[in-house]
A protein has these predicted regions:
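Membrane-embedded transmembrane-helix bundle of lipid-linked glycan/lipid transferases
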Residues: 1-280
Length: 280
């Protein structure tokens, strides 16, 4: 099935698109991002001791932070390997290139499974992968967790759609993709669960009935996801219950909310990355 979807031509096109998209970083081999970049690089470097201890005293100014117990690291581990076998700049930008290329392939696969059209799939893949929100994550915020989560979200969409498939194992993709998301970015998991619940409510109001087969598949997916994610969820819960977490600052998000008016609409269609919009 994958051979039918992907050809050498598609691979070459997406390899070129990824290189063109990340050309500003590769041109002078710079590390972009001004907000979370240092945090995520330190997170990646701290994985050198992850299989012996989640706490690394060589990073984060030797504070011995518990970050790896509370922030999933599995999908970030390749970044550590790339940095280890090259150097910081090459490893970081090469990781961005690989993630961008994989995102293009995932988006193409997801849309092709839905539409069976290569042109539509290519348009979706390129628009999603080069969207302003994803560009902000790379070139401004350096939010590696959210960036990796964005690569997985299309698979979750497809997994949810496949729940309506008559095949008994159609829930497997949702379980696997949700597990990957849990091992990548916890906040995205919470947001995704909210969106799934909203979609189910809308579907219920449309059909005016509860579809038992759908509920059964969701329960199966949830159980398998939970079991596959215990390696992260277990230690996180254990550490949360074991000790109090003190936060130096608690923000009031309501004060920073964006008004969905003229400014938001204009920001959605202009070419300024720093403006607030729908993320395209």
């Amino acid at each position: 099935n994958l051979k039918k979807i992907f050809s050498v031509k598609i691979f070459i096109v997406y390899a070129f698109v990824s290189l063109l998209y990340l050309f500003p970083a590769f041109k002078n081999m710079e590390i972009f991002g001004f907000y979370d970049t240092a945090f995520h690089i330190n997170r990646a470097l701290s994985l050198e001791s992850i299989f012996s201890s989640p706490i690394n005293f060589e990073t984060f100014r030797s504070y011995g932070m518990q970050v790896n117990n509370f922030y999933p690291w599995l999908t970030l581990y390749p970044l550590f390997l790339l940095i280890k076998f090259t150097n910081l700049a090459i490893g970081y930008n090469l990781f961005l290139y690989i993630v961008t290329l994989i995102t293009l392939f995932i988006c193409h696969y997801v849309m092709y499974e839905i539409t069976k059209k290569h042109v539509t799939s290519s348009f979706f893949a390129i628009i999603y992968t080069t969207s302003s929100f994803r560009s902000v994550e790379i070139f401004l915020r350096g939010a590696m967790g959210e960036l990796l989560a964005m690569s997985i979200l299309p698979l979750i969409l497809l997994g949810f759609i496949k729940l309506y498939d008559s095949k008994k194992e159609s829930w497997v993709m949702l379980a696997i993709s949700m597990t990957l998301l849990i091992y990548t970015h916890v906040l995205s998991v919470a947001m995704t669960m909210v969106m799934i619940i909203i979609a189910l409510i809308i579907q219920f109001y449309r059909k005016k009935k509860i579809e038992i087969f759908l509920i059964i598949k969701l329960i199966k997916a949830a159980i398998v996801t939970l079991l596959l994610s215990l390696a992260f969820i277990g230690p996180m819960i254990e550490q949360t219950l074991y000790q109090d977490l003190n936060r130096p600052y608690v923000d009031i998000l309501q004060k920073r909310a964006i008004y969905l008016g003229k400014e938001f609409l204009i920001g959605s269609i202009d070419s300024e990355l720093l403006s607030f919009g729908i993320g395209l």
